[in-house]
Amino acid sequence: MTAIYLMSMLFGLACGQAMSFCFPTEYTMHVERKECAYCLTINTTICAGYCMTRDINGKLFLPKYALSQDVCTYRDFMYKTVEIPGCPRHVTPYFSYPVAVSCKCGKCNTDYSDCIHEAIKTNYCTKPQKSYVVGFSI
């Protein structure tokens, strides 16, 4: 009985180490428009984590679609819209952004994901900041 229990625990640990860790993660982004007076700080969720993948030897003989690797990407998401404060009348003050509801390991879809290897470091404000909290700005 103890041997079965011990083996099942070891099997569970081995499977747990092999699983992917891809889930919604809190993320803060800064949004500004050159015509508007303020920068808006938004707290949202994005998909982040690690996915199990294998690098195939013999890449020369495989079609391109077989060479792509899985990434942590959206399974389900919704869009929220906020109003950037301090915009003149001729400028549309609304900004829409995705909120991750659930994530999965899969192929990167460029229709709604940024599939680059290295992010550009532009997540900062050059104008006075306003924070956005659940439906209204402060």
UniProtKB/Swiss-Prot annotation:
One of its GO terms (biological process) is G protein-coupled receptor signaling pathway. GO terms for cellular component: cytoplasm; extracellular space. Keywords: Disulfide bond, Glycoprotein, Hormone, Secreted, Signal. PROSITE patterns: GLYCO_HORMONE_BETA_1 (PS00261), GLYCO_HORMONE_BETA_2 (PS00689). The keyword Glycoprotein applies. Its main location: secreted. It is found in: Secreted. CDD domains: GHB_like (cd00069). Disulfide bonds join C22-C72, C36-C87, C39-C125, C47-C103, C51-C105, C108-C115. The keyword Glycoprotein applies. Residues 133-138 form a propeptide. GO terms for molecular function: hormone activity. Glycans are attached at N43. It holds the Pfam family Cys_knot. Residues 1-20 form the signal peptide. SMART domains: GHB. Indispensable for the control of thyroid structure and metabolism. Heterodimer of a common alpha chain and a unique beta chain which confers biological specificity to thyrotropin, lutropin, follitropin and gonadotropin. Belongs to the glycoprotein hormones subunit beta family. This is Thyrotropin subunit beta. It comes from Canis lupus familiaris (Dog). The lineage of its organism: Eukaryota, Metazoa, Chordata, Craniata, Vertebrata. The gene is TSHB.
